[in-house]
Curated annotation (Swiss-Prot):
Residues 108-118 are annotated as: LID. The lineage of its organism: Eukaryota, Metazoa, Chordata, Craniata, Vertebrata. It comes from the Eukaryota. Broad-specificity nucleoside monophosphate (NMP) kinase that catalyzes the reversible transfer of the terminal phosphate group between nucleoside triphosphates and monophosphates. Also has ATPase activity. Involved in the late cytoplasmic maturation steps of the 40S ribosomal particles, specifically 18S rRNA maturation. While NMP activity is not required for ribosome maturation, ATPase activity is. Associates transiently with small ribosomal subunit protein uS11. ATP hydrolysis breaks the interaction with uS11. One of its GO terms (cellular component) is nucleoplasm. This is Adenylate kinase isoenzyme 6. The keyword Acetylation does not apply. ATP binds at G13, G15, K16, T17, T18, R109, K148. It is an enzyme of class 2 (transferase).
Length: 172
C-alpha cells in the first residue's frame, strides 16, 4: 500500500514536534525530526558561532532520508524546507503561531535575545511560508494555526482526514 509523505515546517517553537509525534501515533506513519536525525548521525558541517549551534549538512541529511522517503509514509519535521527534493512530499503544512505566544515558547526554551528576536522576525515576515511556497507546488502548501491545544486537535483531525483520502485515491 502506498502511503503519503508529509512535511511539517515553520519557525522554531510553533509546535511541529508536538503535532508530528501525535500525528504519527494516530496515523501509523513514521515520524522523523530532522534535528534529532542530525544529532544522532552527527550530520553536521561546522558550527555557527553567532547562533551557538551546529550547521546542518543538508546533503548528508538527504542521503540519510532518501530510501525512507521513496518508501513513503513519513512525517518530516524541520524548520527549513528549501533543500529537500520536491518529489519527496505529497503535502506541506506550515505551522503559524501568534508572535506573543511564540515569544513565550521560545523564552521558555532559553533562547538568547538575538535568536529569540530573529525567530520572531522570521514568523512576522512569513519567511518559512514563503520558502515553502517557492520550494513546492502552491496547491500542496497549507498554513495551519498553532496557538492553543484546540487548534492542535483540529489540525490532527484535518490531516488524518487528508491522509485517509490520499490513501483511498492512490491505492485503488
Amino acid at each position: 500500500m502506498r502511503l503519503p509523505n508529509i512535511l511539517l515546517t515553520g519557525t522554531p517553537g510553533v509546535g511541529k514536534t508536538t503535532l508530528g509525534k501525535e500525528l504519527a501515533s494516530r496515523s501509523g506513519l513514521k515520524y522523523v525530526n530532522v534535528g534529532d536525525l542530525a544529532r544522532e548521525g552527527e550530520l553536521y558541517d561546522g558550527f555557527d558561532e553567532e547562533y551557538n549551534c551546529p550547521i546542518l549538512d543538508e546533503d548528508r541529511v538527504i542521503d540519510e532520508l532518501d530510501t525512507q522517503m521513496r518508501d513513503g509514509g513519513v512525517i518530516v519535521d524541520y524548520h527549513g524546507c528549501d533543500f529537500f527534493p520536491e518529489r519527496w512530499f505529497h503535502i506541506v503544512f506550515v505551522l503559524r503561531t501568534e508572535t506573543s505566544v511564540l515569544y513565550k515558547r521560545l523564552e521558555t526554551r532559553g533562547y538568547s535575545e538575538k535568536k529569540l528576536n530573529d525567530n520572531i522576525q522570521c514568523e512576522i515576515f512569513q519567511v518559512l511560508y514563503e520558502e515553502a511556497m517557492e520550494s513546492y507546488k502552491e496547491e500542496i502548501v497549507h498554513q495551519l494555526p498553532s496557538n492553543k491545544p484546540e487548534e492542535l486537535e483540529e489540525n490532527i483531525s484535518q490531516i488524518l482526514k487528508w491522509i485517509e483520502q490520499w490513501i483511498k485515491d492512490h491505492n485503488s
